[in-house]
Amino acid sequence: MNQEVIAKRYASALFQIALEQQQLDQIEEDIRAVRQALAENGEFLSLLSNPKLSLDKKKALVREAFAGVSAPVQHTLLLLLERHRFGIVPELAEQFIALANDARGIAEAVAYSARPLTDEELQALSDVFAKKVGKETLRIENIVDPELIGGVKLRIGNRIYDGSVSGQLERIQRQLIS
């Protein structure tokens, strides 16, 4: 079975538990922390896939490494470890965050700009573009792109809204050529 499908099933189960226990915010925060910890420590995943290490030792490592996370997240991690599917944790995190965002009417977005955007500018972008994608609000990550002359390029899911000066110049160039 496809890893993405498997991750989505585990994410859905964890999401249902989060809703039932009214811990959606806490579990989302924990799952983001787990995802970040695994991204920063790639050796940890390699260690857990080592066949020479017993399952009990692997469980002890996971309990110790993620002692601060909520019980549902820790139980999910241990279950994945038992079923030799710990490698899907990053994908599970992505799927869980998508489910949580969907439930709240939030979309993830990335804003590329020539300089860091202020909170007011990010809020203005969120207000305008959230309506365009049918969401209540956007959670925007701002990335400074020195190649942009000015303006903003916004990516929401697989759509890109290009309001950058360089993007406008490219469109003008295409119009002049054709």
Curated annotation (Swiss-Prot):
Instruction: One GO cellular component term, please give it.
Output: plasma membrane
Protein's membrane topology: Peripheral membrane protein
According to the UniProt entry, its GO molecular function terms are: proton-transporting ATP synthase activity, rotational mechanism
Say which species the protein is native to.
Answer: Geobacillus thermodenitrificans (strain NG80-2)
- Official protein name in the record: ATP synthase subunit delta
Among PROSITE patterns, the record links this protein to:
ATPASE_DELTA
InterPro entries referenced in this protein's UniProt entry, alphabetically: ATP_synth_OSCP/delta_N_sf (IPR026015), ATPase_OSCP/d_CS (IPR020781), ATPase_OSCP/dsu (IPR000711)
Gene (UniProt): atpH
What does the organism's lineage look like at the top? Bacteria, Bacillati, Bacillota, Bacilli, Bacillales
PANTHER family tied to this protein: ATP SYNTHASE DELTA CHAIN (PTHR11910)
Where does the record say this protein resides?
Cell membrane
Q: Which keywords fit this entry according to its UniProt record?
A: ATP synthesis, Cell membrane, CF(1), Hydrogen ion transport, Ion transport, Membrane, Transport
| Family label | Belongs to the ATPase delta chain family.
